[in-house]
């Protein structure tokens, strides 16, 4: 399983990615409102930031899962899914995302 497949699996079986994107988007929009009018970002730039944060989020999940599964390029997708389901990781992920609070720096 690669990162794109993991993203697709999580997105199809959980609301974690959607909720994460919503939180990042809200945070970026709040930060954007505090910028000087001439320096405010357009919606496309905000969406690029949302995508960047989401890629990092999925990358971190992927790396941790790969270590836990002891995966390599030949590890079947089914082994990933079995591990995710047996350990109820999607429920844990949704709970973790619900508790995320982006703090002002």
What is the predicted role of each segment?
Residues 4, 100-105:
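Short acidic DE-rich linear segments
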Residues 6-7, 65, 89-93:
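Generic detector of leucine side chains in alpha-helical contexts
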Residues 91-101:
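C-terminal non-catalytic accessory extensions
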């Amino acid at each position: 399983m690669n990162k794109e497949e993991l993203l697709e699996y999580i997105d199809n079986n959980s609301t974690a990615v959607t909720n994460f994107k919503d939180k990042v988007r809200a945070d970026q929009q709040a930060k954007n409102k505090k910028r000087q009018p001439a320096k405010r970002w357009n919606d496309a730039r905000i969406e690029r930031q949302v995508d960047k944060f989401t890629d990092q989020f999925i990358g971190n999940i992927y790396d941790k899962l790969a270590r836990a599964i002891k995966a390599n390029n030949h590890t079947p997708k089914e082994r990933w899914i079995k591990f995710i389901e047996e350990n109820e990781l999607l429920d844990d992920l949704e709970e973790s995302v619900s508790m995320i609070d982006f703090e002002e720096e």
